[in-house]
């Protein structure tokens, strides 16, 4: 398969303008605060869109429709996963974000050193670096197979083009380039997704006809009996709600790639608004690419040859390629190029943020501990940060060649990787924020036990939904640390690192914040009703 010259021209212009924008934004960079948190001068709306774009990767565009249309046990039930988002945002806005922003830190793991000790900080930083770069390799892999399919380029060239273009504009522009490019990419991506949905409904004879041809068993069924704890129902209601809650708490509240956007805000109130907007806007976006999955599923029912036309992986159709195959077969020249630009946009909006956060954590938690850097200028430190960004980008590219067999659905693959550590991560931050006597030794022992327990579930308890790993890891980490500290910890921490209502009021707590929490809870109820009656 190959694309026409006009499509290549569209792609080239987009990538060229992206690098040009990054070069322009780089001229104001003077130090690490400029490079990693944009000197804390960014508007909440821009940061909210950037955070949303980071979450909406190419793997979501590929994986969500594949899950809805084809995955065993899948269907529109994926929307149940979104119930947890508004609830998790409320908790993040009340308990987690205020403490991080008050400390004026770049790496969120610096909080763990202030609250516990150095080894806890380095352990969590290392865990983040290891898991996040591996998940980034999955992202690069997912979009590169699409580039290979549409353009006719080899997989190797597809990986290199995607990886190095992202590395170049990330190195040049830093977090500010990431924020503005994410906004552009989000506009392109949303526009293309809406176009694809309208195109599908048009060829299927309308919205109602699309649902009529969609297999009935793949519609949402809210079964409150199934629990996913050994009953084989991996995507039952309870693991998606409760497990999803802890997953999103960890991802949005205790993951550097997301929280770093919150640390770019002008003030505490603007930062609160970022998470509020994400809690509202994420569901419509997820609903959009799930509806595309409905359209693809309906299209495959009408066109029986469609599934057989999908490339095979171990003799099984690669359903992750269903959307791009449909686009290639149906869209005119030029529009295919725009579609590929949208896929590039989705991939880059995830990759750029992750690479910058990997660089920030490496620089702040490891490199800057070397006293020799005290003799270097701010410009030299900036150079080191860019060099570290390049290193992580190259490593992610290399890993992309080794992640093919993790899961048949790339979206599930990424969430499985994250779910191994999400529970322990939120567990250790909760210990810091909510308890006064737990020390670093207790926290580290809890983290290790939580991770090992999740690993045991993956290897030996296949019937337990991976969504429960987020809960199991949290409970084990929290309980073990509490028990250990009861016997071995006599110290009490600085109260400024532990949440209290008095502390919360000092952060600017007001009626606007209360209204946001109420709106998010109402939004949770609305989403539940939409899912129940859909």
PLM regions and their residue ranges:
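Membrane-embedded helix-loop-helix hairpins and adjacent transmembrane boundary segments
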Residues: 1-534
């Amino acid at each position: 398969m190959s694309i026409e010259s006009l499509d290549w021209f569209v792609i080239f212009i987009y990538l060229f303008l992206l690098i040009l924008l990054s070069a322009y934004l780089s001229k104001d960079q003077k130090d690490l605060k400029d490079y990693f948190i944009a000197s804390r001068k960014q508007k909440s709306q821009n940061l909210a869109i950037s955070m949303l774009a980071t979450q909406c990767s190419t793997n979501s565009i590929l994986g969500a429709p594949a899950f809805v249309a084809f995955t065993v046990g899948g269907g529109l039930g994926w929307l149940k996963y979104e119930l947890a988002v508004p609830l998790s945002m409320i908790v993040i806005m009340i308990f987690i974000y205020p403490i991080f922003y008050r400390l004026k830190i770049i790496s969120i793991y610096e909080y763990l050193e202030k609250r516990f000790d150095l080894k806890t900080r380095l352990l969590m930083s290392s865990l983040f670096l290891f898991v996040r770069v591996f998940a980034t390799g999955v992202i690069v892999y997912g979009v590169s197979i699409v580039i290979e399919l549409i353009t006719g380029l080899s997989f190797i060239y597809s990986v290199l083009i995607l990886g190095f273009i992202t590395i170049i504009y990330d190195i040049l522009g830093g977090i500010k380039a990431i924020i503005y490019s994410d906004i552009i990419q989000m506009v392109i991506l949303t526009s293309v997704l809406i176009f694809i949905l309208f195109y599908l409904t048009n060829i299927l004879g309308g919205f109602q006809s699309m649902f009529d041809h969609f297999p009935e068993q793949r519609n949402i069924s809210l079964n409150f009996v199934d629990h996913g704890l050994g009953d084989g129902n991996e995507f039952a209601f309870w693991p998606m709600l409760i497990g999803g809650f802890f997953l999103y708490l960890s991802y949005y509240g205790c993951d550097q790639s997301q929280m770093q956007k919150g640390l770019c805000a002008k003030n505490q109130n603007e930062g609160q608004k970022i998470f509020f907007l994400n809690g509202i806007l994420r569901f419509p976006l997820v609903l959009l690419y799930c509806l595309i999955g409905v359209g693809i599923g309906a299209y495959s029912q009408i066109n029986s040859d469609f599934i057989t036309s999908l490339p095979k992986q171990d003799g099984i159709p690669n359903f992750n390629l269903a959307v791009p195959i449909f686009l290639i077969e149906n869209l005119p020249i030029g529009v295919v190029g725009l579609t590929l630009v949208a896929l590039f946009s989705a991939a880059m909006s995830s990759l750029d943020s992750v690479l910058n956060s990997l660089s920030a954590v490496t620089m702040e938690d490891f490199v800057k501990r070397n006293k020799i850097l005290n003799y270097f200028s701010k410009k030299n430190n900036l150079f080191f940060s860019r060099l570290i960004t390049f290193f992580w980008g190259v490593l992610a590219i290399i890993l992309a060649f080794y992640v093919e067999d993790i899961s048949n659905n790339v979206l599930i693959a990424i969430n499985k990787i994250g779910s191994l550590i999400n529970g322990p991560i939120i567990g250790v931050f909760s210990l810091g924020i909510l308890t006064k006597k737990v020390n670093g030794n207790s926290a580290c022992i809890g983290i290790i036990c939580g991770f090992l327990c999740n690993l045991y579930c993956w290897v030996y308890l296949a019937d337990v939904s991976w969504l429960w790993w987020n809960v199991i890891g949290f409970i084990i980490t929290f309980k073990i640390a509490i028990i250990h500290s009861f016997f071995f910890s006599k110290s009490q921490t600085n109260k400024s690192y532990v949440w209290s209502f008095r502390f919360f009021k000092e952060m600017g707590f007001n009626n606007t914040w209360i209204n946001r929490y109420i709106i998010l809870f109402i939004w949770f109820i609305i989403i539940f009703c939409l899912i129940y009656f859909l």
